[in-house]
């Protein structure tokens, strides 16, 4: 009986923060600005927003960027700038729906590429320091 109760409580603790509306609220309060994406040279950077007026994350903006700027082949891939931490169970919903579709790239590599290209690194520098 105790095992069953413990399993139910643990299941609820893991499941509830990943329910759609609750997950968006938890992510807005704890992870706003954490989920960042960029191409290799840093000419495109996107941050996933979680306010209730924000739409879900989409690559449409990146596709438009590619269509309008025609970057080099290596800069046509979007990378996530955050590591997937399985202990952060409240992020599992985001990890499984979005994060697993993008390869990880260290933000410092993006920063170096931005410096080499002469781009402003102020925004990404703040993100690297906060990681």
Regions found by a protein language model. Name each.
Residues 3-80:
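N-terminal export/targeting and maturation segments
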Residues 46-131:
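Extracytosolic and intramembrane catalytic regions of membrane-associated proteins
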């Amino acid at each position: 009986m105790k095992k069953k109760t413990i399993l139910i409580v643990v299941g609820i603790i893991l499941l509830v923060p990943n329910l759609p509306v609750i997950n968006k609220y938890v992510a807005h309060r704890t992870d706003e600005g954490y989920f960042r994406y960029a191409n290799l040279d840093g000419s495109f950077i996107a941050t996933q927003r979680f306010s209730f007026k924000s739409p879900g994350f989409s690559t449409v903006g990146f596709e438009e960027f590619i269509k309008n700027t025609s970057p080099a082949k290596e800069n046509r891939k979007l990378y996530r700038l955050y590591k997937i931490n399985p202990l952060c169970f409240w992020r599992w919903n985001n990890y499984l729906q979005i994060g697993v579709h993008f390869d990880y790239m260290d933000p410092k590599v993006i920063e170096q590429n931005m410096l080499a290209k002469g781009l402003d690194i102020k925004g990404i520098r703040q993100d690297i320091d906060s990681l």
